[in-house]
Swiss-Prot record:
This is Y-box-binding protein 1. It comes from Oryctolagus cuniculus. Gene3D superfamilies: Nucleic acid-binding proteins (2.40.50.140). Residues 58-128 form the CSD domain. The modification Phosphoserine is found at residues 102, 165, 167, 174, 176, 314. The gene is YBX1. Keywords: Acetylation, Activator, Cytoplasm, DNA-binding, Isopeptide bond, Mitogen, mRNA processing, mRNA splicing, Nucleus, Phosphoprotein, Repressor, RNA-binding, Secreted, Transcription, Transcription regulation, Ubl conjugation.
Length: 324
């Protein structure tokens, strides 16, 4: 029995300690000047248990200084004129425009006082009446970071416009005026949001359509090399200006180029049929001139061979004279 009594005595001692601590906290709460704050602090201290003990709640104070970079500072309580340590993690409602949690110097703040390892600390820091804190002027704003959601916004509206347009197409039996308005609104919105995607197809179409037409005109106009000179220049223009579109144009041009080459060959044959006769006559005259010049000093055989055509030429002249 004596051993059981001894074992029961040690657990009886610890409850006395919290009673003393509660007694010590009472003057602190009563000294704060808030009659309702005392019992509120005691009731909140009981559930806190392992957490930090709450000394006072909803205390107003003025920020003495706050370092945004290090993320801590001190608040001077308006009731007891004591300095309370504040960490940036204790700020409950931060300014939504600020990127970091902070408190401005000289700002009036509402907070709860909690016992920390080295003294009183602030917790649940907000503005007076639960309003978000203004924050330090040295803290970075989020204005620069708002541009990204603004850029993402138009595509969402763009999708909504498509949905509205689809719903308008389904309701074709309705009035014609709203359909006309929807049709008028579509191109404007499409042009605003994705201008680059709309410009490229319009820029591509004339490039594919124009060159073959111009090539045909050049073929019909000149039989020389003007058409051939114009084509490689255009290809170089396409290659230099838009290298990605090299594969597209040649596929469309191959059949036309083949047809153009056939036309050129036909034209070349026609020109050859017209041009070679004068060139042959000229060559014959040259050969006739060369042949009589060479044989005189060398052999008489060649002169004999050259004489019969002269005789033959005189014979038709005589025949022409007889006919006259």
């Amino acid at each position: 029995m004596s051993s059981e009594a001894e074992t029961q005595q040690p657990p009886a001692a610890p409850p006395a300690a919290p009673a003393l601590s509660a007694a010590e906290t009472k003057p602190g709460t009563t000294g704060s000047g808030a009659g309702s704050g005392g019992p509120g602090g005691l009731t909140s201290a009981a559930p806190a248990g392992g957490d930090k003990k709450v000394i006072a709640t909803k205390v107003l104070g003025t920020v003495k200084w706050f370092n945004v970079r290090n993320g801590y500072g001190f608040i001077n309580r308006n009731d007891t004129k004591e300095d309370v340590f504040v960490h940036q993690t204790a700020i409950k409602k931060n300014n939504p425009r600020k990127y970091l949690r902070s408190v401005g110097d000289g700002e009036t703040v509402e907070f709860d006082v909690v016992e920390g390892e080295k003294g009183a600390e602030a917790a649940n820091v907000t503005g007076p009446g639960g309003v978000p804190v203004q924050g330090s002027k040295y803290a970075a704003d989020r204005n620069h970071y708002r541009r990204y959601p603004r850029r993402r916004g138009p595509p969402r509206n763009y999708q909504q416009n498509y949905q509205n347009s689809e719903s308008g197409e389904k309701n074709e039996g309705s009035e014609s005026a709203p359909e006309g308005q929807a049709q008028q609104r579509r191109p404007y919105r499409r042009r605003r949001f994705p201008p680059y995607y709309m410009r490229r197809p319009y820029g591509r179409r004339p490039q594919y359509s124009n060159p073959p037409v111009q090539g045909e005109v050049m073929e019909g106009a000149d039989n020389q090399g003007a058409g051939e000179q114009g084509r490689p220049v255009r290809q170089n223009m396409y290659r230099g200006y838009r290298p990605r579109f090299r594969r597209g144009p040649p596929r469309q041009r191959q059949p036309r180029e083949d047809g153009n080459e056939e036309d050129k060959e036909n034209q070349g044959d026609e020109t050859q049929g017209q041009q070679p006769p004068p060139s042959r006559y000229r060559r014959n005259f040259n050969y006739r001139r060369r042949r009589p010049d060479n044989p005189k000093p060398q052999d008489g055989k060649e002169t004999k061979a050259a004489d019969p055509p002269a005789e033959n030429s005189s014979a038709p002249e005589a025949e022409q004279g007889g006919a006259e």
